[in-house]
């Protein structure tokens, strides 16, 4: 068996490809079930964010398992395989392990060190557990990744002052118009990203902010987090009139199709000399045809790279500190994985000794007579179990701790020969 990851990210694919392969949480269950149904995939988990889609799998045949995942991606994205392969990356075993730990630590993010990805990794693990598509290997790997992500944030300074997608979007707007305090701003969406947008806009002095959202309850919840700011709340039926009256519009919704198009914008009268649309959603909320309108400037997540780059150089030394720490976590996972080849032998030996214990206990109790056996069986049972456990404990600890692969293999072979054990090789 092997661990593989097949995916694409902001580093390998533009937003127009990423949005085709984005899997919303509502469709994760069916995607996981579909993947688990392939003959060479034993465990599977999916990370799907605006900047990456990565499928982690335990495969019984590496080449065939990778082909199955690639075929799945081509099908859901309706992208020909020969086109899709240009944008995909595939990593195996230790490289796949290291990659997930780097993702969890924010080292693979568009915004180096950003913290939101750790929560997304946790959610990936939770969903895979919920839908029963991970078992021993991926469960341990994701737990190791979450530990690594937490350690990087507590033991290094990489998360300090990190920009986020939301803050980068506000910085982009600020760079284009300089004075945000005088601008009318609309935010379409009322989720976490929208809340962060409001926070960063307030820091830039913005006061005229409107929230447009399908659910008024969620919009009101967001507004309650900013009691000193008179946020204006609108439903989707007022979206276009609110957009037309704004100078800058941020979009951050879970819509799978564009909600702002050239056609919709031409149907309203734009009051500003120039309307700036900044779309931080994947799939995109703003259609590319809006750029054909003279009054409109449109940007998406890929346009944030220049803003982020200015923040990156000062963080590279911090990233090197984090990488050293991550190597410790990679090694910890590798040691655990290598120790799995001892499990079948240990289980087989324990089972054989337990059979002997039960047989000898039954003989002893029959000799002691019914009355004595009934009165003292529990004590005798506990004593014999204790003897077995104490005899096995030290050899088992030493066997698991043996880091030299060849030395451990010789120990296992000796045990199998001396005790006449028939052992499969489930994890080797």
Swiss-Prot record:
Catalytic activity, EC: 1.2.1.70
Superkingdom classification of source: Bacteria
Residues bound to NADP(+): 189-194
Function: Catalyzes the NADPH-dependent reduction of glutamyl-tRNA(Glu) to glutamate 1-semialdehyde (GSA).
NCBIfam families: hemA, PRK00045.1-3
Extra facts: During catalysis, the active site Cys acts as a nucleophile attacking the alpha-carbonyl group of tRNA-bound glutamate with the formation of a thioester intermediate between enzyme and glutamate, and the concomitant release of tRNA(Glu). The thioester intermediate is finally reduced by direct hydride transfer from NADPH, to form the product GSA.
Protein name in UniProt: Glutamyl-tRNA reductase
Source organism of this protein record: Microcystis aeruginosa (strain NIES-843 / IAM M-2473)
């Amino acid at each position: 068996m092997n661990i593989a990851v097949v995916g694409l990210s902001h580093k390998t694919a533009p937003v127009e490809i990423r949005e085709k392969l984005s899997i919303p949480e509502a469709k994760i269950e069916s995607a996981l079930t579909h993947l688990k149904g392939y003959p060479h995939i034993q465990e599977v988990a999916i990370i799907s964010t605006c900047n990456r889609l990565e499928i982690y799998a335990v495969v019984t045949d590496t080449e065939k398992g990778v082909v199955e995942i690639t075929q799945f991606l081509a099908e859901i994205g309706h992208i020909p395989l020969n086109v899709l392969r240009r944008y995909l990356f595939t990593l195996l075993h230790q490289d796949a392990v290291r990659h997930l730990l780097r993702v969890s630590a924010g080292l693979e993010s568009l915004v180096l060190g950003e913290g939101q990805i750790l929560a997304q990794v946790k959610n990936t693990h939770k969903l895979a557990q919920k839908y029963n598509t991970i078992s021993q290997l991926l469960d341990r790997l994701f737990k190791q990744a979450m530990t690594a992500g937490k350690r990087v944030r507590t033991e290094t300074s990489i998360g300090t002052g990190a920009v986020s997608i939301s803050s980068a979007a506000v910085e982009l707007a600020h760079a284009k118009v300089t004075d945000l305090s005088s601008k009318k701003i609309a935010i379409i969406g009322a989720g976490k990203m929208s809340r962060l947008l409001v926070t960063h806009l307030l820091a830039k002095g913005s006061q005229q902010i409107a929230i447009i959202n399908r659910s008024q309850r969620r919009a009101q919840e967001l507004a309650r987090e900013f009691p000193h700011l008179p946020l204006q709340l609108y439903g989707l039926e007022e979206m276009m009139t609110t957009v037309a009256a704004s100078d800058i519009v941020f979009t951050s919704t879970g819509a799978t199709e564009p909600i702002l198009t050239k056609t919709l914008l031409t149907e309203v009268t734009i009051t500003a000399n120039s309307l700036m649309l900044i779309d931080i959603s994947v799939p995109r909320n703003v259609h590319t045809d809006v750029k054909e309108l003279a009054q409109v400037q449109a940007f998406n997540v890929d346009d944030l790279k220049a803003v982020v780059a200015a923040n990156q150089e000062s963080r590279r030394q911090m990233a090197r500190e984090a990488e050293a720490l991550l190597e410790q976590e990679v090694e910890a996972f590798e040691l655990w994985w290598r120790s799995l080849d001892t499990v079948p032998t240990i289980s087989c030996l324990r089972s054989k000794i337990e059979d002997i214990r039960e047989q000898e206990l039954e003989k002893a109790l029959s000799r002691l007579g019914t009355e004595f056996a009934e009165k003292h069986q529990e004590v005798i049972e506990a004593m014999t179990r204790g003897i077995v456990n104490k005899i096995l404990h030290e050899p088992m600890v030493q066997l698991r701790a043996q880091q030299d692969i060849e030395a451990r293999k010789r120990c296992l072979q000796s045990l199998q020969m001396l005790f006449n054990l028939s052992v499969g090789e489930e994890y080797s």
